[in-house]
Amino acid sequence: MTANRIKRFIKIFIATACTVAVSCQAFACKRTINIKQSEIDICADEIRNYLDAKTAQDQFTALANAMGSQLDRQYASIEYSSENGKTYRVFAFNVNDDNERFVVRGRGGKATGGLFIPGETYRLKIVGMSDYDEDFFNATAWKNQYSDYVTEEKTVKIKDSPVRFITLNSGYNYRDLGGWETETGKKICYGKIYRGARTNGFSEKDIAIFKDNLHIKSEIDLRNSNDDGGQNSSILGDDINYLKAPMSQYSYILPSFSLNGRTFDTNSPAEIKRIFEFLADEHNYPLFFHCNAGADRTGTLAFLILGSLGVTIGDLTRDFELTSFSQGGTRLRGKFQEPFEYGIMQDDANNFVAWGDMISRIKSDYPTSDGKLSSSIKKYLTTECKISAEILSKIADVLLSK
């Protein structure tokens, strides 16, 4: 990118960011997509524009138009005919997987949200009851007795996408890690592994989503005693396999790191090994990993997992930057200044965000003959974290499409 192009881009970015800052919050609340068409897109338009952008400049412009605007949810509005005095629920059934189903609450002839999986087809049953029924009012699953109250049925195809946000009532920045394609053409399976923010303060409804709909069996908590709110077990229940593995983020996990008084966290490699050994056990899935905001430590672990499986640097960066569409905080691959600096977005007393610095260090510290980032990540994991090739192979068997 030439100096003149950089200057023009920076001006566009700053001007756009200033313009949208005051309006994106209200705009996000209005954004819905109805399902009268045969295929729907559960991504907000702003996220779709970002995913479809072909150049770094277009990606950053898309981010500037919407970052921080709470778009981390599914934007499908299910419209149906309704009658006064009736309570409505929409039950969604994956036609390819009978175990994958969920409920969306309706009001005023519309039910917004859902847990749809991109690329899948769903059979929707709209159920309306006149008499108050507590089980139905708080329904999280289908019951056969609801069959007598079905008012409409329709089938809908969900547009394919590498992004599946999980809509919650009391949290933000939760999403499925599935959907990304690897260098070999395989895909990360949906419904296996989820990333997100803290679970402290989860509502009963959100706990039900994690247990009854996502079928979470395990939780990996990346926080330490300074920010975990005293949590040392899963709030999802005693039957959840809970691993506390406090690791650092970005370049802190690399022995060569030393910058502006910041240095390598010597404990991180051992914690990463514990995490990957946990990931290698197929009985721990589906699982959920998180830190506090679901951005830095979570983003670093997602990078190691997806990168070791062969997801490209472009898609690794997209997964990282998707946090910018939530309240988790803006996370970019670099910062905007003259000259343009790629690699470190923030380095001050409040935070250290160094996505590009981490990538460049891993590639230079762990070079391989094929020059692939995925190979350098594997080399780091096997040499520095002492993770066996067998462990990495088992994780691939669980998470990659056949």
Task: Spell out what each predicted region is.
Residues 2-14:
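Bacterial N-terminal signal peptides that target proteins for export
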Residues 7-10, 24, 295-296:
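Residue-level micro-sites within transmembrane alpha helices that shape
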Residues 18-25:
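Hydrophobic core
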